[in-house]
Structure formats: C-alpha cells, structure tokens
A protein has these predicted regions:
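Transmembrane beta-strands of outer-membrane beta-barrel pores
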Residues: 19-23, 63-67, 109, 120-124, ...
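Solvent-exposed loop segments that connect transmembrane elements
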Residues: 26-34, 71-89, 130-156, 199-251, ...
C-alpha cells in the first residue's frame, strides 16, 4: 500500500508499506520444517521539500525485516523423491533487519548545481544452515550409494552486523565554461564497521550428535534448534554449546572496519559540434583495519591495509551523423586491497605446531587490483530510432587481480592476487522494435583471457579428492 500526500506547494511525501507472509513450498522431510517460506515487512517513506525556486531537500528512510526458515538447497546426492523435498538434519533459520536513512540536497548556483548526498545504513543478519546438505547418519536412505562420505556440518549461527555511513558532495556545470567545457568535481567519504561471528559444528566421529560442550563468550546458542527434541542430549546449561571433543569446526569473531575517501573531476571538451574529448581523474585513499579472533584465540590478528591510487579516463567521441557515434577510450581502474578473515600459517608456524609444512597461499592482507582498459566502438540508431546497434572491442590488462583462494592449512582461505593477467574480446548488441507487439534483443560476445605471470595456488578439486572417509 502507498499514499502520496501534498502537504503544501513546497512539501510532499510518499509512503509505502508492504507485508508478505506465505507458507513454504518446499519441505525438509526429516524434521518437517517448511522451507522457501516468507515473512517480510517493508516500509519506505520519501519526503521532498522545495526550499526555494533554486534549491530542494529530499529525505528518505527505509526499513526491511525478514524472519524465514530459509531456502531449500538440496544436496547433489539427496535422493528424496520430489524436487521440492529434501532430507537434512538442521532446523534452519534466516533473519535479516535492514535500516536506511538518507538525504539529498540540491542548490542551483546559476553556473553550476551543488549537490550533497548523505546516508546511514545498518544491516543485521542471523543464519542457521545445514552445510553438508545431506543427512547420511540419521537418514542414510536419502543419500545416493555413489555419494562421497558426508560428515554432518552446520553453521549455528553465522551472524553479522554492518553499519555504513557515506557522504558525497559534487558540483555539476549548468553551462559550458568558455562555451566549450562541461565539468563536474566532487568528493566522497565512506566509513564502515562490521561485527561478524561464525559457529561451525562437525560430527567428526559420526555418531549423530555434536559431542561435548564448552562455554561460548558471545553466543548462548539454542541446541534445540539443531535436532528434534527426541535427539537432544541432556545436561546443557545456559551459556554452553555443543562441540567439545573435536566436534567443532570453524569458529570466528571478527571486527573489520573500512574508511575511504576520494576526490574526483571530469571535463568534456566540445571541440566541435561532432567531436568531444572527455578527460577525468580520481584520487582514492582507502584504509582497512580488522581484529580477527579465530578458534577462540587459536589465530588472532590485528590487520591493517592502506591503499592509495590515482585513476583516470581519456575518451574521444565523434558523431558520424545524427544517429551514429564512434568512440575510443583509455581508462585506469582500481579496486582497493583489504584483509582476510582467515589466512595460512607461515612455514615456521606450521613447524612449531607440528603441522605438515606448506607455504602460505592466503595472506593476512591482499593487494589492490588495478586495470588498464582500452576500448573502441560504435553506437548507432536506425529506422527512426526503432533499431539500435552497439559494437565494441576491448583489451584489459590487470595487475594483482583479486580472486578467491584456498590455503593448504585447514579452514583457511580468502582473497589472493594474480600478479598479471589479460582479457580481450568483442561484443555486439542489437535492440529493435519490429512491430507494436514484437521486439528484438540480440547480444553476442567473444572473450579470450590469459594469466600472464606465474604464481602458486591450490587446486580445490584435487585437494578435496584426497580427503579420506573416517
């Protein structure tokens, strides 16, 4: 439901509320839980105040809440009849609460428009899920005979609280400087704080329960959420969770923060009615700090990574006529570095702990990614604007490309860097209105990519195939 209210000639608002509630259309046959259900509440209000003929202020807020059992993700070897039914030994849960408040102020200065944008957002998520996606111990008939051995694994819970503040101010020209230069200048700031917790349990001895208990400094996890009441072990006291005697896996408490600011500017030089030269630059300073406490003190790190970079773009556009344009561009791009939640032990640390010695492949921090991009193309409209064709060719050269990597040490993986790689290709797009009832949408692309430098990484498929059943 929505309502628009014009309070006066200068003040108006629009408010919307949406409620969704439905039973699940999938079922966990082991515990009877309905999955793919929905219990959502959404609220948004948007207010516009005309301060004067040349200035305005817009303020908006949004709230969203979800309290569901979670999605039905059926294991690959789950033989439960009916694609909407599965057998898993976890009572899953998905909860999300999101709040957003923002404002936009616009002020016409005559020669330019000044715009200020600010926002605050807070998201809280809480998830309980079955990580092995099967039920080999409690319902072996639901798992195919050809399946590999599955140890019971679940996250109970995985939670995160994320709070982000942003502010941006920019100025956009209303009329070309000296009659030929359009321009924009601005600055951006972001501050983000995250608190994350993960509790993973493993049925390592394959007896159907997570043996033992221990005190959790952060969670009073409800063991009754894990299994039907008939399977609950007795004697659990408040503040204790299962997982002693080796039946707990990845445990993490992490507190990353990010602070980023940048300044930027761009101008378009109108050389003639047909030719334009576009040039822009941006300077970014990005700092990540993270306190990581994994395995309740087994791996502790105070991590920090600062990335600074100046990027830019130079482009040429030439109108072949009223309906066609050719262009070329040279662009420098940048993705800041950061810190990892988990990372490998050094060879010295492996030796001191009596582990098999292997070089670390995932490090506490990772480097910034940068790209040098070249592109040429043509954009054309035909048949009185009823047909549009875009064709482009491109070449990208990456330094320190970021990718998701796995470390030889167990429970450790994160982002690593490929020192050098290249990507090139071409793409074409045709969109047309053939008749009042029929449209055409055609897209095609060819792509060739290559890693141009040597680096060490772990083949996950080969590594996993060497893990024996207990």
């Amino acid at each position: 439901a929505s309502i628009n209210i014009p309070f006066s000639d200068s003040l108006a608002s629009r408010t919307s509320v949406s409620l969704t509630s439905r039973d699940g259309f999938s079922q966990n046959v082991f515990n009877g839980q309905e999955l793919d259900d929905a219990d959502h509440t959404s609220f948004r209000t948007d207010w516009l105040l005309e301060l004067s003929d040349t200035s305005s202020l817009r303020v908006f807020g949004q709230y969203f809440d979800a309290d569901n059992n979670g999605a039905a993700i059926k294991g690959f070897y789950d033989t439960t009849p009916d694609r909407r039914k599965l057998s898993q030994n976890t009572l899953s849960k998905y909860q999300l609460e999101s709040k957003i408040v923002g404002g936009i102020g616009e002020f016409d200065l005559g020669y330019a428009t000044l715009k200020a944008l600010a926002s605050w957002q807070k998201d809280e998520i809480y998830v309980v899920r079955d990580n092995d996606r099967h039920n080999l111990f409690h319902d072996p008939s639901s798992v195919a005979a050809t399946a590999p051995f599955y140890v019971g694994v679940e996250f109970n819970p995985e939670s995160q609280i994320q709070e982000t503040n942003t502010f941006e101010i920019n100025m956009i020209s209303n009329e070309p400087f000296n009659g030929v230069f359009d321009w924009i200048i601005g600055a951006f700031y972001m501050d983000q704080e995250i608190e994350g917790h993960i509790r993973e349990f493993l049925d390592d001895n394959f007896n159907g329960v997570y043996d033992g208990t221990f005190a959790d400094p952060y969670f009073d996890t409800s063991y009754s959420n894990m299994f039907p009441a008939s399977m609950l072990p007795a004697g659990l006291s408040p503040g204790q969770i299962p997982g002693g005697a080796g039946d707990w896996g990845f445990m993490s408490d992490n507190y990353p923060t990010r602070e980023s600011y940048s300044v930027y500017g761009q101008t378009t030089f109108n050389v003639s009615d047909a030719l334009r030269i576009i040039a822009g630059a941006r300077y970014t300073d990005d700092t990540v700090e993270s306190y990581v406490n994994n395995f309740f003190g087994g791996q502790i790190g105070n991590l920090e990574k600062t990335s600074t970079k100046t990027t830019g773009r130079l482009a040429f556009e030439y109108d072949l006529g009223l309906n066609s344009m050719i262009y070329s561009s040279f662009t420098l791009g940048f993705k800041p570095g950061g810190s990892n939640l988990t990372y490998g032990y050094t060879e010295a640390e492996d030796a001191s702990m009596g582990n098999a010695i292997a070089p670390p492949l995932v490090f506490p921090t990772f480097e910034s990614e940068s790209v040098t991009a070249y592109e040429v193309g043509i954009k054309s409209d035909f048949i009185d604007g009823r047909m549009r064709a875009n064709v482009a060719a491109f070449f990208y050269q990456y330094d320190d490309l970021q990718f998701q990597a796995t470390d030889p040490d167990v429970f450790r993986g994160g982002v690593a860097n490929i020192p050098g790689s290249e990507m090139k290709g071409a793409e074409a797009e045709i969109i047309g209105i053939l008749t009042d009832e029929l449209t055409l949408d055609f897209k095609a692309a060819i792509l060739d990519s290559e890693v141009t430098t040597d680096f060490e990484t772990l083949d996950n498929v080969k590594a996993n195939s060497t893990i024996p059943a207990p």
